[in-house]
Amino acid sequence: MNLRNYVLVTAGYWAFTLTDGALRMLVLLHFNELGYSPVAIAFLFLGYEFMGILTNLIGGWVGSRTGLNRTLIVGLGLQVVALIALSFQQQSWAEIGSVVFVMSAQALSGIAKDLTKMSAKSAVKFVAGDGDGALFKMVAILTGSKNALKGVGFFLGAALLAAFGYDAALWAMAIVLSVTLVVVATMLTGDIGKSKVKAPLRSILSKSDAINRLSAARFFLFASRDIWFVVALPIYLDDVLGWSFYGVGGFLAAWVIGYGAVQSMAPRFLGRHSEIVAARNWSLTLALISALIAIAVAANLSRAATTVAILSGLVVFGVVFALNSSLHSYLILAYSDDDQVSTDVGFYYSANAAGRLVGTLLSGVLYLWGGLELALWGTTMFVAITWLLTLRLPATPAMSRDPNPDPDTNPNRAFS
């Protein structure tokens, strides 16, 4: 794949990511203001997450047969449709009708998100070259920049809601993304990532032990984040602390932007160490941080002290989570074969989406049952399971072939 096509794929992915982050904040804050319960708000996002599971499985297979450029264009188009559809929901509707309608529209957005993400991340494999160092750095830059832009999207969504209202914000995003779609569709050329061998449909579930184990770890890692992030923390900031739309959106935006920045610089932070050892060490560190935040909330400190403990603790959580996520994003490409990269990545991100679905549901349920404290204990348990799963990750193919595994003397290590 030439660099021009890669730039177009990445630009399309970035534009989509802005609308994706903004839409999440729009929906969450809008329906919280309408008086929907934490569980009802969680259900609004379940269609989005559930379709992500299916899309990653099937989308990777479709991408390998038709080319990643086509899956990207379809993803952008579906997001435009979802944004416009959401603008037709009326406040006068019964709550159950609104929940079902928004879930359905969000399901389209979930398909769109994972088609574009799978397309962009799989494309990295075809432009990075054979060196693991280049691959890791390009994955880190793409993933980090995506999350930074998603954070900007969070703030953008909150700002658009406060300034223009729900419907106008949706239409504005649909128009901008439509322009992006036209540019990408007319300028993108070739069949990016099209497999030379037509893999059968059953290949979407035929994975190596390494990919299965990494996917299981990814499931629990992302579920652990969304347990506190998706519903519990925003409602806590809005209802308990009384923050404004700008405050809630601003903090979540800053968190995701910082998280993305750390991901982009992950190769520098991690140094010259084995990816597998680093994944184990940083997941254990994340579990300890989660437990400390939960203990601080349970300690019945003053409101100001509790707020400082939660917010500062979650900032540290974000740094360590970003390192874990970046390591996983590198490992899936390192474990993948060139001719199966889109199906391997699709399977892996279907596990990611399944984790987000479970985390989203638990975020609403645990917050309803025990507030932010119980949500944080749920996070701790899921991160601990992630750590246990990383203990069984095998060496990457490059490491297995390496006659000199010492990272201090081998110049070909990924973290250089």
Please provide the spans of the model-predicted regions.
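Conserved MFS/SLC helix-loop-helix module at the cytosolic interface between two early adjacent transmembrane helices
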Residues: 53-91
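Helix-to-loop junctions at the C-terminal end of transmembrane segments
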Residues: 55-68, 161, 261-278, 367
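Helix-loop boundary and gating motifs at the non-cytosolic
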Residues: 1-50, 212-252
